[in-house]
Amino acid sequence: MGVTRRQLLWAGAGIGAAGALAACSSGAGGPEDTAAAAGSASEQPRSGGTLKVGALGKASAVTRDPHGSQANESDYLILSLVHDTLAVPGDTTNTAPRLASSWKPSEDLRTWRFTVAEGARFHDGTPVTAEDVVWSLKRLRATPAGASRLPGIKAGSITAEDARTVVLVSDYANADLPLLTRLTTFVLKKDTKDDQIATAPGTGPFKLDWFRDGNARLVRNDDWYGGKVLLDAVEVSIFESPQAMANALLAGQIDVASNVGAVAARTAESRKDVRILRRPNDMAMPVVMRTADGPFADPRVREALRLAVDREAMVKQVLSGYGTIGNDILGTGDPAFAKDIPQRGRDLARARQLLADAGFDTARTYDLLTTEDISGLAESATLFATQVREAGVKINVVKQDPKVFWDATWLKAPLYTTYWGTNDSVVFFASKTMVSESGQNEAGWREPAFDEAYRKALGTADATERAKVLHQLQEIEHAKSGYLLWGMADGIDLAGAPVRNLPTLPGYGRVQLDKTWLAR
């Protein structure tokens, strides 16, 4: 898998955010506990204690560079606690302030001014300046995935206006530009040398105490500009498998098993000393149907496949009930997501008729390419193949090695599975995977009306008018795109009974532990 693909996944939910999803025979989900670690209203948050967190990763893929490719969730967690980004996912909005306290666009939505938070300092006491931010963003832009991390913003278009004001000038009008600052916009001190990056002081709520082989201890930053941090320390332990991580939590060796998955959640359901935290809309697992050419280019064929799938059965069996059905639109975590577009249901008779009208060759067997890059992906392909056979479509599931899949299949094959974090915006997915000029147009889709709606959305500042345009964009995607989004997987954490106020946002939002505390 290439660097760009990994970084885009982290933009939403991180690598392996589906955890240990697997087909189970049990029903539609365990005890919902999205407020699990919040504590009761009568409890007062306490200071102190060390939170021990398990996170997925491989020792061979460890990175210490905040602007590198974080293939390990453990690395991203550590980096996110030490180094703040300019913005973060919000509870009610796509973007909330962090190291940047505010931002304001020009009238044409091309020039944006970001203000560095008052009182923000590096861990060595040095004030954070606009020059530090500019240097860091230019370093980020120079990475192999830089164009995807800061699309439309060239290095020369990143400048400091004064000590606390950073100016970003986009090549085009972009009402969603602040979204870009939620990703890996970690800020380092200007001119930090590459051989000092691993131990460079950050600006986050925790300071690095030690790091060994992917494991780390972080201690509270008492001078954090973002407010009082409750925990004394966070210890992060790296685990190569969700099951090993779950076992460590059940044995009391760690307090939190992050992104542990549905199988472990089922195991923990009977434990009164363990809480299951569900983060809705954490991972989308669509089937991609190539629209540019091949057997699925006819929109009637794509519609037939969408009508042939049993979405509720997919969620129940593939996700063990820890998820929700999809409606073939990416960006389900966006407040602008069009929930009023009619939900597709299963209609085998209509599917067969559409296939006949399109002259689809039902005598042929078609390959559906997948990989076990995340657990549950291959299982979803197998169940999908079984379901669409009832409409007369014969599918042969081909499991590929992840490297082969991402190098030879992704963006090219007529029919394959993929996965994305879904707490990103509708416009994010449009820009990355669906507009005609996208370099990662997974289905090879070209639809002038969609492109026009996308450009209009980027250039519209008025909230009411923008909402109308975004709705139109989603209607087109729902009707014509190459995606069959049958469901979204919940992110699942396991937490010991004393843990309080774990974040419930999907994707990057779940690594914000500055308000977490321990009732012990």
Predicted regions and their residues:
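Ligand-site clamp/hinge motif
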Residues: 222-267, 394
